[in-house]
Each structure stands twice: as structure tokens, then as C-alpha cells.
Swiss-Prot record:
Residues 24-35, 98-100 are periplasmic. This is Probable 4-amino-4-deoxy-L-arabinose-phosphoundecaprenol flippase subunit ArnF. Heterodimer of ArnE and ArnF. Keywords: Cell inner membrane, Cell membrane, Lipid A biosynthesis, Lipid biosynthesis, Lipid metabolism, Lipopolysaccharide biosynthesis, Membrane, Transmembrane, Transmembrane helix, Transport. GO terms for cellular component: plasma membrane. The gene is arnF. GO terms for molecular function: carbohydrate derivative transmembrane transporter activity; transmembrane transporter activity. It is a multi-pass membrane protein. NCBIfam families: PRK02971.1-2 (NF002816). Disruption phenotype: Cells lacking this gene are polymyxin sensitive. Lipid A is no longer modified with L-Ara4N even though the level of the lipid-linked donor of the L-Ara4N moiety, alpha-L-Ara4N-phosphoundecaprenol, is not reduced. However, the alpha-L-Ara4N-phosphoundecaprenol is less concentrated on the periplasmic surface of the inner membrane when compared to wild-type.
Length: 128
């Protein structure tokens, strides 16, 4: 059950991260504070996506709280690395994100996935 909550948390956090990235690239920079505030108050699509991203992170924290009650800490924190993989893939697949493929990034993803498999593969107990 803890693994399920952890996966929910990772998926929701990944979507939230993509939402915040979209909002950050479309809203005025915070260095132009009044333009930024005006865009937020207009509550256009960019501001709504920003709000959804923030709410997504909040929901992700709830799922993470449930994860930590059910799953060993050493396994739970390893799950967080899945978010890097999901966001990398989504940035290349989703239109408008212009994520780039590189062998270096693929190697990093392979390392993350290998590490997760090592952590989550069942262990066999040896009898002596």
C-alpha cells in the first residue's frame, strides 16, 4: 500500500512540476513584480495552471505522508528519483516543451532505473 501512495506522490509531483514550469515560462518574470501580480490577478490560463501546480504539490505531500507511514524510508526516498525520469520523458513527448534527447541524459535515466530495481527487487534470505 505504501508503494502505491509513493507512486501517486511521484506522478502528481511530476505533473505539478510540469505545470509550474509551463506557468513560469508564460507568466511575466517576478523581477517585473507588478506585471507578475497583474497576470496573477487576471487569473488567465497561466495563473490557473500555476495554481493547479501548487495544489498538485500539496496533494503530493499528502500522498507522501501516507507513503512514509507504510514504506521503509530507504525505499520511499528512492522513489523520488522517478520524478526526474517522468519529467524528462514528458518534456520530450509533450508538444511545446522542447525537451532534448541526449545520450548523457539517457545514461542518467538508466542509472536511476537500475538503482530503483536494485532497491526494490525482492531479496532472498539465505539459511545457514
Amino acid at each position: 500500500m505504501g508503494l502505491m501512495w509513493g507512486l501517486f506522490s511521484v506522478i502528481i509531483a511530476s505533473v505539478a512540476q510540469l505545470s509550474l514550469g509551463f506557468a513560469a515560462s508564460h507568466l511575466p518574470p517576478m523581477t517585473h513584480l507588478w506585471d507578475f501580480i497583474a497576470a496573477l490577478l487576471a487569473f488567465g490560463l497561466d495563473a490557473r495552471i500555476l495554481l493547479l501546480g501548487l495544489l498538485g504539490y500539496l496533494l503530493s505531500v499528502f500522498c507522501w505522508y501516507k507513503t512514509l507511514h507504510k514504506l521503509a524510508l530507504s525505499k520511499a526516498y528512492a522513489l523520488l528519483s522517478m520524478s526526474y525520469v517522468l519529467v524528462w520523458i514528458a518534456s520530450m513527448v509533450l508538444p511545446g516543451w522542447e525537451g532534448t534527447f541526449s545520450l548523457k541524459a539517457l545514461l542518467g535515466v538508466a542509472c536511476i532505473m537500475s538503482g530503483l530495481m536494485l532497491i526494490f527487487l525482492p531479496t532472498t534470505k539465505q539459511r545457514y
